């Protein structure tokens, strides 16, 4: 179901792309996957205050390219680029290959699901009321162009004894629609009462596919195959020859007799009656009473 499954994984083959893009055979796949997880955990701890939205890992031939999407690129780069150089050395040591690190700026962090979740968890750790933090984030997202947003918080909210779950939604969030561009992010708040989990769904509109445009091509083909339908039945005129009179009009009387004007006959037969010559049988001459022959 669309409400239960991860929205990113649900749309991977349609409108989303993978966050790790490389190929490995069966022997090397597990090791490379473990390296990716290790790198992501390291960047999560190292760049905790840099507002990192997502990390893209690519592995061309015997190299690695890591793209970091951040709302605060200056924190990642550091003074005169010192921090990013140290980051490259550490990542190269972990992966064992040369690493190129690229920084991409997130223009609107208010409508990025991961950054919204991180912002709410930071406020929860500062003992701000969870309802106030959630509603403020929703207002900012809708104000900056999001078509819909849903936020869910789970755990010992406000320090209550029994954990519960609360969620709020504004706008529309169509999780079942595959062409819908749904941004999904999660985060955890480490509070004195325990962990509070935050999930965020942001609806940004419909998309026509990934960067290669395969989704747009599929939609165009489907539209061409769809044949146009004719007008509605009640919009057609009622004076067609193969149809009767309009609805509500008086009907002509029916009977077994033929019409007097010959309208039931073909046009040629009806017109031929005017030029026909009537045949009159000539009567035989009457015989004489005395039986004599007349000349």
From Swiss-Prot:
Residues 246-255, 283-295 have a biased composition (Low complexity). Pfam families: KH_2, Ribosomal_S3_C. Residues 224-245 have a biased composition (Basic and acidic residues). InterPro entries: KH_dom (IPR004087), KH_dom-like_a/b (IPR015946), KH_dom_type_2 (IPR004044), KH_sf_prok-type (IPR009019), Ribosomal_S3_C_sf (IPR036419), Ribosomal_uS3_bac-typ (IPR005704), Ribosomal_uS3_C (IPR001351), Ribosomal_uS3_CS (IPR018280). SMART domains: KH. SUPFAM superfamilies: Prokaryotic type KH domain (KH-domain type II), Ribosomal protein S3 C-terminal domain. Keywords: Ribonucleoprotein, Ribosomal protein, RNA-binding, rRNA-binding. GO terms for biological process: translation. Residues 213-295 are annotated as: Disordered. It comes from the Bacteria. CDD domains: KH-II_30S_S3. One of its GO terms (cellular component) is cytosolic small ribosomal subunit. Part of the 30S ribosomal subunit. Forms a tight complex with proteins S10 and S14. HAMAP family: Ribosomal_uS3_B. Belongs to the universal ribosomal protein uS3 family. This is Small ribosomal subunit protein uS3. It comes from Polaromonas naphthalenivorans (strain CJ2). The gene is rpsC.
